[in-house]
Amino acid sequence: MAQHTAAAAGGDEEVAEAEAAAAAAAGSTLRHRHAGKGAEEHEAAGGGGGGRNGGADDPDATSVERVFADKAVPSWREQLTLRAFVVSALLAVMFSVIVMKLNLTTGIIPSLNVSAGLLGFFFVRLWTSAVERIGLLKQPFTRQENTVIQTCVVSAYGIAFSGGFGSYLFGMSETIAKQATEAKDAQNIKDPHLGWMIGFLFLVSFIGLFALVPLRKIMIVDYKLTYPSGTATAYLINGFHTPEGAKLAKKQVKTLGKYFLFSFFWGFFQWFYTAGDDCGFKNFPTLGLEAYNNRFFFDFSPTYVGVGMICPYIVNVSVLLGGILSWGVMWPLIAKKKGSWYPADISDNSLHGLQAYRVFISIALILGDGLYNFLKVLIRTIAGFISMVQNNSKGMLPVSDNGMSMSTAEEVSFDDERRTEIFLKDQIPKSVAYGGYVVVAALSIGTLPEIFPQLKWYYILVAYIVAPVLAFCNAYGSGLTDWSLASTYGKLAIFVFGAWAGLSHGGVLVGLAACGVMMSIVSTASDLMQDFKTGYLTLASPRSMFISQVIGTGMGCVIAPCVFWLFYKAFSNIGTSGTEYPAPYAIVYRNMAILGVDGFNSLPENCLTLCYIFFAAAIAINLIRDLAPHKVSRFIPLPMAMAIPFYIGSYFAIDMFLGSVILFVWEKLNKAKADAFGPAVASGLICGDGIWTLPQSILALAKVKPPICMKFLSRAANAKVDSFLAG
């Protein structure tokens, strides 16, 4: 912690530079670090359009495009450069490794847009500087090319998440099936293999790109949907390409590199002490052995300290509260009912025992939270359409950047006029969109049953008929709130298609595969609209954005399965509860699929009652959050975040809370530097520890074992060991 607080206590000159650069980047460059999927939607939506429309008395002072007025906008072909895609591929591998590690440990994926943007800017600047010195630079680095890189990288590493390697895809495996209550037959199991995973992702990941392309003008120009994450990314990129922003970006990259090296070498140092099970700093009983047995300890993970610095305070506090409620109160109390509520002769890790309460109560919280937010966004979407119908008759557009109606007769700003002109210049033919959707759908309908024989062609046909409607709802809702409900639509598919198939016809596998189909379409369509918003605000061509998204998706369909395969082969205990890589959402998704086809027959006593209580509590807490004044609601925890430690424990919650404390203290000491450099520090901690996983995996594959086991024993256990060794 001393390192972080010391970094915050820099000189006044650096603070002034940071403040000036932040102001030059339209005030919102780094303020939106929380505006990612799964982040606090109210914070994201509230700041999404800020900084751009203020100061109406002096348009030149607040106009972003007047700053770049003397720079020609490159054609869409010039925006697609070889160096952009080389850098994108390198960063895609890096971030796919990081996301995969997060997937397989806790399933919490923070927004990595800031680090992706910083590193993309840095590497191409490095490239162009080197080429310029030898006099071979033909094309300068523009913000449009920067946007292409950002789009390509995010779409590539996004496959590591939406591909289901920590959820539905891995949930099909025998490893996870053995830990479930039933459906362990061959009909409901499919183990991972590199070939079919790559094929599956190519079949399902592209169709979402075609679903909403014809509606881009309506969503971005006519409705003026905010898309806070896309807006924040655009401000970040615009800021980099001003003189002040470039200067700040260099300092941020230097800071990121410093903490990257610290985190990487800390991971390397820890490796030497992990020669056996439960060895090393990751198993340090910092709060005592009894707390350690209940999964309360600090595991010295730079990754989750960094995640805690990126996630909103309320998320981190919610996760910690969930850990205290479950592992500190509920599970010890339920454990005392052993022999009464569930058989005394089975392990606590059996889904016929205590583990059932851990898994199914967390599922109840997740489903309650998901259902509430699904209905909330659906209501807002319907309300938006009603507003559109009413206002169209009055010559009004339904939504402006501040969420208010805007007259078509209202004076259009220089920025909006310039952006709309460029955005409508390079059209994507509707024949490409419609034809692409039909062709990819036909290929999927014909080929997916070869990968999953249980997944009949008519299941896929129904999914592809319904998917564009759901994709539009999700993209519209995401534009309003920054809240993507792709995983909720995926869970809905689990129940609908799993129940349709039935347990005896591989319903569990059908539900999980259908979840992947639906999630991929809905998530990709929403992400594409976010990227179109970024392109709109940086004058990047929609055509170059679409091509970049296609190339990035193709990269991800190869890179993500290869990275997962590396983990799967290098670490033998992936997916096992209580290990370094428990893949918690894999067991959660599989048990959802079992519930969808078989109901609640196998749950232990009172488990279903507790599930009902927590399902209702999740809805009630969300309702109170929305009805209460902001000064009260910002202290009410998030049920979805509380559910995460119910199954895997609180060790990562302590890491994340420590990250929050570090950032909070830093902001109190020096808010300007914390705002400017906090995301860079966090990204360095996450990236360094994540990238260390690559050499660690290679060492494991080469059968190179660490030399030392550092383990902690109680006094009594130590005495027994000493006695045994003494003979």
UniProtKB/Swiss-Prot annotation:
Keyword DNA repair: no
Membrane topology: Multi-pass membrane protein
GO molecular-function terms, A-Z: oligopeptide transmembrane transporter activity
Bias type Low complexity, positions: 1-10, 18-27
Pfam families named among the record's database cross-references: OPT
Membrane-traversing stretches: 84-104, 107-127, 152-172, 194-214, 256-276, 314-334, 359-379, 432-452, 460-480, 492-512, 546-566, 604-624, 646-666, 681-701
Location relative to the cell: Membrane
Composition skew (Gly residues), residue ranges: 45-54
Protein keywords: Membrane, Transmembrane, Transmembrane helix, Transport
Protein name according to UniProt: Probable metal-nicotianamine transporter YSL14
Organism of provenance: Oryza sativa subsp. japonica (Rice)
Species classification: Eukaryota, Viridiplantae, Streptophyta, Embryophyta, Tracheophyta
